[in-house]
Amino acid sequence: MREFRRVRRVRFAACALVAAATGITLAAGPASADIPIGQKMTGKMTYYTDKGYGACGTPIDASSQDLVAIPAAWWTTPNPNNDPLCRGVSVEVSYNGRTIRVPVRDKCPSCDRTHIDLSQAAFAKLAPLDRGVVNGITWKFVR
């Protein structure tokens, strides 16, 4: 009986430790309310041409569709399909007197917080493709 109680305590302690670690992990990311809707940011844009499924779990073709991949730092859930960014959030991007609005459909793991990766189609509406990287853009999250 005594051995059973010890095993039970060890199991309970292990479960409590896992629960605490999970709680800390989940609490570490910003909540959906922390998406700074409307707050202008200055940064850079690049483009990509991937085809398949984006981080939001929907089919994408970055060579022909208007969309944006957002830096990993803005994603708040372990499963990006469930992330608030995938629920009607777009990005308004301005450069050189032009502005476009593109839906968030993907994640950019190599982008810092102010670097966005536009689809080739969207990038071409703001700058020539041969630029590849454009600094000095402004962008913001919009609904």
Swiss-Prot record:
GO terms for cellular component: extracellular space. Induction: By heat stress. Residues 1-33 form the signal peptide. The keyword Transmembrane does not apply. SUPFAM superfamilies: Barwin-like endoglucanases (SSF50685). Pfam families: DPBB_1 (PF03330). One of its GO terms (biological process) is negative regulation of peptidase activity. Thermostable. Activity is stable between 20-40 degrees Celsius. Retains about 70% activity after 60 minutes at 100 degrees Celsius. Its main location: secreted. The keyword Lipoprotein does not apply. Keywords: Protease inhibitor, Secreted, Serine protease inhibitor, Signal, Thiol protease inhibitor. Coiled coil: none annotated. GO terms for molecular function: cysteine-type endopeptidase inhibitor activity; serine-type endopeptidase inhibitor activity. Gene3D superfamilies: RlpA-like domain (2.40.40.10). It is found in: Secreted. Monomer. Stress protein produced under hyperthermal stress conditions. Serves as a glutamine and lysine donor substrate for transglutaminase. Inhibits the cysteine proteases papain and bromelain as well as the bovine serine protease trypsin. Has hardly any or no effect on subtilisin, bovine chymotrypsin, proteinase K from T.album, transglutaminase-activating metalloproteinase (TAMEP) from S.mobaraensis, dispase from B.polymyxa, thermolysin from B.thermoproteolyticus or collagenase from C.histolyticum. This is Papain inhibitor. It comes from Streptomyces mobaraensis (Streptoverticillium mobaraense). The lineage of its organism: Bacteria, Bacillati, Actinomycetota, Actinomycetes, Kitasatosporales.
